[in-house]
């Protein structure tokens, strides 16, 4: 979702932690729109509609130029599973409190504050917020509709909002399986035009 417009579709996701992600994107009527492959070594987005592929390093700059969203590789992997950036080595605990049956934990960082809200019943992360040094929100993320999947609580709904960029991403899962072998690879069609970034 952006000020320019929003779009929706469906996807099949294969995620192999800690290093690879394959997303098959479908548009209206199930039309195969494209394929996104992320690994620690490579970023590849294949546009099925015009037979082009964008290839680059999986760094924040490449990802930002493609999706106009400032997220690093690990942040994207964690977002698909409803995890968010854990406290870093230099972060210090700012405060702990309980509000509306949620544990609110704040950490001070070099660049501002990280806020975690944890459900008091399930101990699952309900929301996460990054604030800059002036206290303005850089990123807000929420999870909901927790489901027990093979003994692990997983969110079926994830929403990430980038207030400064006026952009948001919403992920809603219909079906999930975990801890099963997956293959995160993709071969480009022979005649695809490849653009390197």
Predicted feature locations:
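A short, Trp-centered hydrophobic/proline-enriched beta-strand micro-motif
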Residues: 1-3
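Short, solvent-exposed loop/edge-beta patches enriched in aromatic
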Residues: 5, 16-19
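Beta-strand-dominated lipid-handling architectures at cellular/organellar boundaries
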Residues: 6-12
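Short, surface-exposed charged micro-motifs
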Residues: 12-14, 33-35, 115-117, 145
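An acidic-aromatic
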Residues: 20-74
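C-terminal low-complexity, charged extensions that often adopt amphipathic alpha-helices
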Residues: 58, 66-95
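Gly/Pro-enriched, hydrophobic low-complexity segments
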Residues: 93-196
């Amino acid at each position: 979702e952006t000020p320019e417009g929003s779009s929706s579709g469906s996807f099949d996701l294969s995620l192999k932690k800690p290093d690879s992600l394959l997303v098959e994107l479908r548009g209206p009527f199930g039309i195969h729109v494209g394929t996104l492959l992320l690994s620690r070594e490579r970023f590849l987005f294949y546009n099925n509609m015009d037979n082009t592929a964008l290839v680059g390093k999986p760094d924040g700059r490449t990802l930002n130029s493609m999706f106009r969203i400032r997220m690093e590789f690990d942040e994207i992997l964690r977002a698909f599973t409803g995890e968010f950036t854990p406290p870093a080595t230099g972060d210090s605990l700012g405060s702990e409190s309980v509000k509306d049956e949620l544990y609110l934990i704040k950490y001070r960082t070099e660049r501002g504050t990280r806020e975690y809200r944890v459900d008091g019943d399930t101990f699952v992360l309900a929301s996460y917020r990054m604030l800059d040094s002036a206290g303005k929100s850089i990123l807000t993320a929420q999870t909901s509709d927790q489901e027990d999947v093979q003994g692990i609580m997983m969110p079926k709904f994830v929403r990430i909002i980038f207030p400064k960029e006026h952009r948001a991403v919403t992920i809603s899962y219909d079906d999930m399986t975990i801890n099963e072998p997956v293959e995160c690879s993709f071969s480009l069609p022979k005649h695809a035009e490849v653009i390197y970034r």
